[in-house]
Amino acid sequence: MTDNINKESTTTTTTIDHTTNLLIDKHVEYIVKLGSKKDSFEYWVTEHIRMNGMYWGLSSLYLLKSLDKLDKNEVIQWLLSCQKSNGGFGGNTSHDDHLLSTLSAVQILIQYDALDKIDINSVVDYVVKLQREDGSFVGDQWGEVDTRFSYAAIMCLSLLKSLDKINCEKAVEYILSCQNFDGGFGSIPGAESHAGQIFTCVGALSILNEINKIDIDKLGWWLSERQLPNGGLNGRPEKSSDVCYSWWVLSALSAIDRLHWIDNDKLKSYILKCQDNETGGIADKPGDIPDVFHTFFGICGLSLMGYFKDQIESIDPVYALGTKTLQKLGLNLPWNKNL
C-alpha cells in the first residue's frame, strides 16, 4: 500500500468465532493499516510488487464493500507515478515496467472507473510489443516467457478493448502447447502442471472463446484432485494446502463449470480457519501470519462458492474483478454463473 492513504477505520471489539464467520470488519481494518507499516520487514521486501499488492488490497476492500476506505485520488496519483515513458507500469515508482504490474494498474483504474486518467493507446502499444512470433508473451524487456504473461496480456487488452491488436490465433496455439498429458498446464511447453498456470491458461482461453479446445473433464479431474482431507487445496500433487489455491483452483473449476466437483463446505471451513481473529487478514495455513495476498484470494474463494452473499460482492473467475464492475464495461462473460 502507499503511504498516507488510510482513512479512519472502526475497531471491532466483539469476539466472533472465526471458524464459522467471516471477520469482515477486522479484514477491512487489516488492509487499511498495511500502508502505514513502514517499519515492518514485509513492507520493504514487497516494495517491488507494491502495484500488485495495491490491486490485492483494493480488490479485497471492493469485495468487502469497503472500497471507500482508501483515498481514491491518492491511490490514482501514486499509480500514475509508476507509469513509464513506454506506456507500461512498474511495481513501484522506482521500479522497471512489467506486464504483471501493468495489468494490476489497469485493474485498479477500472475499479475506480478512472481509465480516462491514462493514455490507453500507449498501454496497448506496450502490451502488444511483448508478443513473440510463436504467440507467447514476455513479461518485460529481459525476455522471460511464461503463460502468466499470456494471460496478463490477453486480459489487459480485453479490458482495454484492443484484442484485435495481437495475433490471437498464435496466442492460443502457444497456450495449447503448454498443456500436459494430465490435462493441466505449465509455465512453458513441457513444464509441470500447476494450478496457478492452469488458472492463467483457462482464463486466457476463456477470454478468447477457445476453451472448447481442451478436454474439460480431464482438466476438471486434475483440479478436483487438489482437495486434501483438511478441505484445503494444493497447487500440484504431493504438496500441502494453501489458501491461495482457493482462487487458482476454484476459478478454473468455475470457468469450466466444474465447481461442484469439490467439497465446497470443507473448503469454506479451511479458509475461515486461516483467518487471524486478532489482527484480521487471512494466512496461507491455519495459525500462520496473514498477508494481503492470501487475504484477497481467501475472500475470492468464498465469493466464488457463493458464501456470505449478503456481505461480499461477486467476483468473476476469469478477470478477477467484481462482476458488477465488468458489467459496466459491457464485456461478455458466458462462464459467469452469477449473471
Swiss-Prot record:
GO biological process, one term: protein geranylgeranylation
UniProt subunit comment: Heterodimer of an alpha and a beta subunit.
Function of the protein: Catalyzes the transfer of a geranyl-geranyl moiety from geranyl-geranyl pyrophosphate to both cysteines in Rab proteins with an -XXCC, -XCXC and -CCXX C-terminal.
Example of a GO MF term: Rab geranylgeranyltransferase activity
GO cellular component assignments: Rab-protein geranylgeranyltransferase complex
Family in the record: Belongs to the protein prenyltransferase subunit beta family.
Keywords: Metal-binding, Prenyltransferase, Repeat, Transferase, Zinc
Spans of repeat PFTB: 24-65, 72-113, 120-161, 168-209, 216-257, 264-306
Short name of any one Pfam family annotated for the protein: Prenyltrans
Cell inner membrane recorded as keyword: no
Enzyme Commission numbers on file: 2.5.1.60
Binding site for Zn(2+): D242, C244, H294
SUPFAM superfamilies xref list: Terpenoid cyclases/Protein prenyltransferases (SSF48239)
InterPro entries assigned: PGGT1B-like, Prenyltrans, Ptb1, Terpenoid_cyclase/PrenylTrfase
Name under which the protein is recorded: Probable geranylgeranyl transferase type-2 subunit beta
Cofactor binding note of this UniProt entry: Binds 1 zinc ion per subunit.
Catalysed reactions, semicolon-separated: geranylgeranyl diphosphate + L-cysteinyl-[protein] = S-geranylgeranyl-L-cysteinyl-[protein] + diphosphate
Signal peptide location: none
Cell division in keyword set: no
Cofactor dependency: Zn(2+)
